[in-house]
Amino acid sequence: MFKLLSKLLVYLTASIMAIASPLAFSVDSSGEYPTVSEIPVGEVRLYQIADGVWSHIATQSFDGAVYPSNGLIVRDGDELLLIDTAWGAKNTAALLAEIEKQIGLPVTRAVSTHFHDDRVGGVDVLRAAGVATYASPSTRRLAEVEGNEIPTHSLEGLSSSGDAVRFGPVELFYPGAAHSTDNLVVYVPSASVLYGGCAIYELSRTSAGNVADADLAEWPTSIERIQQHYPEAQFVIPGHGLPGGLDLLKHTTNVVKAHTNRSVVE
């Protein structure tokens, strides 16, 4: 009887802690997630996912349309780690101002997950603010070739598919080529948050979009590596649009394969 009561007490305690924990969020919290229509270009919104973890959301005009773009903010002691710029100098300056207003901790380091302007545009603003900017050697090289802003410091140990390195409160993972040959994903172990960047699509997206620098053949395999490496992820943030769960990975694979099949037929 005593053992039975002890087990029951442990179960009840764990249940109460799970309910009370700030990390016990629901993936359906994306219903409150800021959307493109709510964010004027030049402004930034922050969305708290868990204790010490936020996404940042900005919008940008491109080819006559306005698109949302996500990034990540993770607390690292009394400092903040920023993942990706807010797509441009004006947006990134607004991001730093919003962080100061809402969080009140300094951003000391920033990682760009690939070389496109929605990830590195604004690096110069960060550098001027005293933020140490990082990217893989591949991203830095491709950004230079593209004429984009170049993060200052190189992240080593991310050259081969499946490589992972710890960087403060997060793990950086190179799944292989997908949206671009250099794209990284970021995992926050303390909150089971996976930031997929542009390698992952939101559920409402049905077209592959910009695949000029993509490796369509390798993309599904790279997503499979992400799934295998982070099966415990609960909250998945795409590069653009609304977050969800691990179902975003399967959805992205389906969209990419459909695009590839159409291209073959055409």
Swiss-Prot record:
Provide the reaction this enzyme catalyses. Answer: a beta-lactam + H2O = a substituted beta-amino acid
Q: Which residues form the signal peptide?
A: 1-20
Q: Required co-factor?
A: Zn(2+)
**Main EC class of this protein?**
hydrolase
Role played: Class B beta-lactamase which confers resistance to the beta-lactam antibiotics, including penicillins, cephalosporins and carbapenems. Acts via hydrolysis of the beta-lactam ring. Has penicillin-, cephalosporin- and carbapenem-hydrolyzing activities.
Q: Which UniProt keywords apply?
A: Antibiotic resistance, Hydrolase, Metal-binding, Periplasm, Signal, Zinc
**What Gene3D superfamilies does the record tag this protein with?**
Ribonuclease Z/Hydroxyacylglutathione hydrolase-like
Q: What is this protein called?
A: Metallo-beta-lactamase VIM-2
Q: Name one GO molecular function term.
A: hydrolase activity
Upper classification of the source organism reads: Bacteria, Pseudomonadati, Pseudomonadota, Gammaproteobacteria, Enterobacterales
Which gene specifies this protein's sequence? VIM-2
**Cellular component terms, GO, for this chain's entry?**
periplasmic space
From which organism does this entry originate? Escherichia coli
Gene Ontology BP term (one): response to antibiotic
